[in-house]
Amino acid sequence: LDQGIHLVDMMRLFAGEFTQVHSFISNAYWKHDIEDNAYALMKTGSGVVGMLHSSATQWRHRFNFEITLTKGALILSGILSGSKSYGAETLTVVYANEDDGGDPREVMIRYNQDNSWQEEIFEFTDSILENKEIKNGSVKEAFETMKLVYQIYCADAIWKSKYNLTSQIPETLLEKTV
């Protein structure tokens, strides 16, 4: 899923674990043994629905993550990457109101610095020096995200058959990584 794996990770962070997964995977454009586009529609046990589109055929790099809530929404766009090709990183907070006539108030915050790598390294170093557990981005979280990516591939029956995928993911793989 290329950059899509980061979206899958974020979807799990905000929505929880997805128990139902439907997908369409295609490599019709580049015709390699990796997907050009992945579309997934997923649902958690508590009823949260998530939708994903990860594309290698969209000619402009895009990163867009939306969380729709009962009284508004959060929209994260762009990535502060080294290539600068994903556009400005912004968070738009939407405040819906029944009297807004379909034009809710929005506040956009633009981020000009990415301190996430530094913060991750500090947390990782601290966990080693202080013998603490990792709070964010544990091996188990990474495994669960990879497992969901695999479930997305397997949910497309044609893709699953074409690449001889099996729905069974040995839990012993996780035990070997921890």
Regions found by a protein language model. Name each.
Residues 45, 126-178:
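C-terminal helix-rich "cap/oligomerization" subdomain common to oxidoreductases
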Residues 1-27, 40-48:
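Oxidoreductase and adenylate-handling cofactor-binding alpha/beta cores
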Residues 17, 70-77, 94, 149-159:
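Phosphate/oxyanion-binding loops and surfaces in catalytic or ligand/nucleic-acid-binding neighborhoods
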Residues 7-8, 88, 118-125, 146-149:
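A general structural signal for well-ordered alpha-helical segments in protein cores
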Residues 28-35, 45-121, 135-138:
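NAD(P)-dinucleotide binding in Rossmann-like oxidoreductases
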Residues 1-2, 9, 115, 140-144:
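A generic "alpha-helical surface" signal
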Residues 8, 34-38, 139, 146:
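Conserved glycosyltransferase catalytic-site signature
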